[in-house]
């Protein structure tokens, strides 16, 4: 038979897998041609055989019958994280003749979760207090994945550390590092926490990183008094024409952000 081509995956060629025990391969273009020969002189393709090698050419799975199909999954393998593997395909005709074997371009195993980063309340740096109950901005950094790469993020907002009571887990692009949410109904004096997790290209999920929290403070401070003069004395008249002094005292509610 004449050889065709093969890809890692079932429909499109993939470069990474999150499994260390299974590999899926698809192939096409293998033929046992009759053109130029008398009818019936070629027996046709009867089945295919599949094998698996590592990047150094060491056998991981010896030649195995895959039947007459064009997609097959190798199971019960023992693959190593971070290593590349190749699946080999060859066709067998009705007379037992073997085609030249073809190899996929390789697939790398990634069973590592992404590295978690740091989450901050606010657009830049980290804030502890906010005075808007409908808008919330937060940012994060230092999430990473060294094998298959980050695919996207998910974030949640809660009233407990790591919780999602206020907003359920929601997707963000892998290029995002700051999110602003609107149309919220945050509650005054309540502390909120932002949680972020990263998902890589083969669906491994990082541990959750959570901000240290911020508290909503929408209560205005109170002014106790304003005096002309010192704190202890309120002047109505003075005999100095070059100096004017004043004193005052204000307070914020408890728990509030303070003056």
PLM segments and residue spans:
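Flexible, low-complexity linkers/stalks enriched in Thr/Pro that connect modular domains
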Residues: 1-9, 13-15, 32, 53, ...
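Structural beta-strand segments of beta-rich domains
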Residues: 21-25, 134-138, 242-246
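Acidic, Ser/Thr
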Residues: 26-42, 139-147, 247-256
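Solvent-exposed loop segments of extracellular immunoglobulin-like
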Residues: 44-48, 149-153, 257-259
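Recognizes extended acidic, P/S/T-rich segments that occur
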Residues: 47-80, 127, 154-187, 235
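A structural signal for beta-strand boundary/capping segments at domain termini and interdomain linkers
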Residues: 59, 98-101, 205-208
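Surface-exposed loops/turns
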Residues: 81-82, 132, 188-189, 240
């Amino acid at each position: 038979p004449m050889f065709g081509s093969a890809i890692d995956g079932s429909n499109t060629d993939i470069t990474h897998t999150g499994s260390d025990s299974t590999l899926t391969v698809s192939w096409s273009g293998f033929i046992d041609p009759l053109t130029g020969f008398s009818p019936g002189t070629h027996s046709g393709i009867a089945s295919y055989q599949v094998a698996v090698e590592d990047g150094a050419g060491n056998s991981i799975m010896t030649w195995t019958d895959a039947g007459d199909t064009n997609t097959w999954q190798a199971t019960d393998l023992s693959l190593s994280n971070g290593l590349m593997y190749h699946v080999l395909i060859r066709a067998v005709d009705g007379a037992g003749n073997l085609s030249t074997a073809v190899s996929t371009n390789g697939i790398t195993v990634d069973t590592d979760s992404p590295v978690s980063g740091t989450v901050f309340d606010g657009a830049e740096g980290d804030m502890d207090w906010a005075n808007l109950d409908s808008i919330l901005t937060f940012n994060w950094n230092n999430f990473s994945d060294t094998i298959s790469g980050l695919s996207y993020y998910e974030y949640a907002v809660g009233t407990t550390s790591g919780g999602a009571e206020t907003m359920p887990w929601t997707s963000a692009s892998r290029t995002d590092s700051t999110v602003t949410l609107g149309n919220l109904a945050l509650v005054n004096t309540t502390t909120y926490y932002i949680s972020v997790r990263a998902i890589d290209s083969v669906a491994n999920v990082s541990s959750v990183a959570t901000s240290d929290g911020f508290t909503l403070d929408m209560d205005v401070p109170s002014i106790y008094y304003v005096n002309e003069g010192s704190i202890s004395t309120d002047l109505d008249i003075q005999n100095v024409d070059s100096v004017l002094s004043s004193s005052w005292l204000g307070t914020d509610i408890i728990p509030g952000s303070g003056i």
